[in-house]
């Protein structure tokens, strides 16, 4: 083959500079995934803070009885809508923790996009604590832009 024929092929080494997203890049992806969720769902989540860490702390894992830090992709901490009250004392904001390393490992083993996995974890962590059914959560994921 001539060099001209080979020039139309993609560079087989073009993947070499690719890396897994850093914590900062992962947070950008998570923020964008949240922004693409249906407006009605985002309104229910007003004030929810999204945190990204590599893995859950030992304290979190111990409190949940989880043996491996790789088994937890996300966690909601706070008070879900069914339990909120106007007369309740001031509380910390609701938070969703996304754990980068377990999510990246899941991504490597499955044929889903990273954005779809992050969206799924976000919706399910928030959704369970807001009393949504699995069907409701799948519909929210489907409607994500």
Stretches with model-predicted labels:
Residues 2-117, 129, 133-136, 144:
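Active-site rim/adjacent substrate-binding subdomains
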Residues 121, 125-129:
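Catalytic glutamate of the conserved HExxH
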Residues 141:
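Auxiliary alpha/beta "docking" domains used to position bulky ligands
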């Amino acid at each position: 083959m001539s060099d001209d024929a080979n020039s139309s092929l993609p560079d087989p080494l073009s993947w070499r500079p690719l890396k897994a997203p850093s914590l900062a890049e992962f947070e950008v992806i998570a923020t964008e995934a949240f922004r693409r969720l249906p407006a009605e769902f985002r309104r229910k989540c007003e004030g929810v803070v999204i945190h990204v860490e590599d893995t859950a702390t030992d304290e979190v894992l111990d409190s949940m009885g989880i043996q491996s830090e790789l088994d937890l992709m996300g966690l909601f901490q706070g008070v879900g809508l069914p339990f909120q009250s106007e007369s309740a004392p001031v509380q910390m904001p609701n938070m969703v923790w996304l754990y980068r390393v377990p999510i990246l490992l899941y991504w490597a083993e499955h044929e889903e996009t990273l954005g779809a996995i992050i969206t799924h974890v976000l919706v399910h962590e928030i959704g369970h604590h807001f009393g949504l059914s699995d069907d409701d959560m799948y519909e929210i994921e489907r409607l994500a832009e």
